[in-house]
């Protein structure tokens, strides 16, 4: 992995006998060239890339931004910056009911010519280990799959003012509360709602195809191409580029591209935004669940093998999948 680690440090967040959050500061940063330090950063980078995220930017007169800029200008060192940051995190976290304990990690690193700063609370769990004598020992380990409090700053984009999406944060298990917590800590505000952007995209594609009076097969083909484009962008770790995506669709009856159409009709779409897989999947599938029923089928099947009666609110399926037929027949 083409990664260079500049600084890495961990501090401990724990509760005392009175269940009050306490902070144990490490005396110095971890050696960034050590195998353990490198393993931690690589694991954290990979974990973070797979999680759904929100986007934000610093507020005007952000305290955290001021400290970050002091560090980047070498007015304070990394240890001083990390100590100030985790103290602020502890104070803010104490206000919330999800005040977890664990290891607070700060990592400054570069990957593919981009500089990042990750701040994360790493949950610690017990596990059983057998030694050479087969004696049982209890050991602590970081449970990456349970990280819900983490944020990453794209320092390169922030310093070059490339966009307003340079802060990302994990959308955690208690939803908005975790988002509020990190935004408060970083003195930041939300700049982009990924799911909303993807939902607007789907509506724009639907309207564009309808206004272009495309035949049903043409319409389904267009939606499939858009889905495949979004899927490939997600797979490659890239955002949707609206002008690029526009090339996947034919011009409408007036000779305008899809991008032109979105501008003319006033769809509030950014020129680039991350892919929300669950949302764009609806381009080629109908998906729904509730009341013990979970249904998913390709949209092209509607009207061919699957029929919907609006008046009776009934779905009729012709040609049951063999594995489902076997289960139904075997349980009669």
From Swiss-Prot:
The keyword Cytoplasm applies. GO terms for cellular component: bacterial nucleoid; cytoplasm. Keywords: Cytoplasm. It is found in: Cytoplasm, Nucleoid. The keyword Nuclease does not apply. GO terms for molecular function: double-stranded DNA binding; single-stranded RNA binding. Its main location: cytoplasm. Belongs to the YejK family. This is Nucleoid-associated protein VVA0877. It comes from Vibrio vulnificus (strain YJ016).
